[in-house]
C-alpha cells in the first residue's frame, strides 16, 4: 500500500487561518502532520517543505501530500485519494482542479483531465522519487534567481513542462479552497482561485475514473513556457514550440 506524508503550509499570524487550520486537521482525522509555519519568503518555506517530504519523512513514505491551511477536504478524502494515487502512482496530481472546463468534463462522465502546467498551490500530491528529482532540477537546471522569482506552484508547472510531464487533475476533486479567507499573497482577484467541481457538486463514483481516459487540456497558463525559456538551462526551441501549440481544445477553452 502507498504510504502518504502530509505537509501543511500554515500562517498562524493570521487569525482566521488558525481556525481554518484546526478545521482542516479535524477533517483529515487522526494522522501525522508536519506543518510549516515560519514567517519567511515563499521560495524559502516551500523548499523546506519539499526537502522534508523528499528527504526526511519516514522511509516507508511513497507519496507526499501538500495542503494549504485554507482548504477543506471531502468526508471520504483518504479513500478517494488512495484510489487516485493507485490510478497514477508515478504522476503529479493537482488536487485544486480549477480549470473552467471541469464541470463540463464531469457532465461528460469523465473523472480526470490533464494539463502541462496547471498545478495550483492549495493541494497536490508528488510521488516521493519524483519530488526528489524536482528538488535536484530546481538546484541544477534553473538559472540563478529563478527559484526566488517564481512562486512555488508555478515552479512545479515549469518543472512539468521542462520534463515533458502531464499533471493529472481529478474531477470532481476532493478539496475545496475556502476563498472567504483572504489570500496571504494578495491573490483574491485571481480568476482561477476556486475549484469549480468538488464532491459537493458532483458524484465521482458515477464517472469514468480510469486515468487513461483523461481529457487533455494542454496549457493552463498563457506564459509559463516563456518562463521556461527565460529561466531553464538547455530549454530547447522545439520543446518551447511544442508547449506553445499544446493549447486547450476549443470546446473546453471557455472561461480561460
Identify the role of each PLM range.
Residues 1-67, 71-256:
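Peripheral/terminal regions associated with large enzymatic or DNA-binding modules
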Amino acid at each position: 500500500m502507498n504510504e502518504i506524508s502530509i505537509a501543511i503550509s500554515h500562517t498562524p499570524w493570521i487569525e482566521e487561518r488558525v481556525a481554518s487550520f484546526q478545521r482542516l486537521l479535524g477533517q483529515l482525522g487522526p494522522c501525522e502532520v508536519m506543518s510549516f509555519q515560519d514567517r519567511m519568503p515563499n521560495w524559502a518555506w516551500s523548499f523546506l517543505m519539499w526537502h522534508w517530504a523528499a528527504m526526511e519523512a519516514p522511509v516507508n513514505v511513497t507519496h507526499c501530500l501538500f495542503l494549504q491551511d485554507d482548504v477543506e477536504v471531502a468526508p471520504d478524502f483518504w479513500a478517494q485519494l488512495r484510489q487516485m494515487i493507485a490510478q497514477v502512482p508515478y504522476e503529479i496530481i493537482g488536487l485544486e482542479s480549477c480549470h473552467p472546463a471541469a464541470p463540463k468534463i464531469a457532465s461528460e462522465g469523465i473523472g480526470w483531465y490533464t494539463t502541462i502546467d496547471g498545478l495550483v498551490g492549495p493541494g497536490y500530491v508528488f510521488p516521493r522519487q519524483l519530488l526528489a528529482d524536482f528538488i535536484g532540477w530546481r538546484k541544477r537546471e534553473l538559472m540563478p534567481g529563478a527559484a526566488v522569482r517564481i512562486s512555488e506552484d508555478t515552479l512545479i508547472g515549469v518543472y512539468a513542462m521542462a520534463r515533458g510531464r502531464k499533471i493529472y487533475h481529478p474531477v470532481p476533486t476532493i478539496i475545496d479552497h475556502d476563498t472567504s479567507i483572504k489570500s496571504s499573497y494578495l491573490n483574491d482577484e485571481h480568476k482561477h482561485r476556486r475549484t469549480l467541481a468538488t464532491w459537493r457538486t458532483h458524484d465521482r463514483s458515477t464517472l469514468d475514473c480510469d486515468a487513461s481516459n483523461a481529457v487533455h487540456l494542454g496549457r493552463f497558463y498563457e506564459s509559463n513556457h516563456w518562463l521556461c525559456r527565460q529561466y531553464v538551462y538547455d530549454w530547447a526551441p522545439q520543446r518551447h514550440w511544442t508547449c506553445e501549440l499544446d493549447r486547450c481544445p476549443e470546446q473546453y477553452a471557455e472561461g480561460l
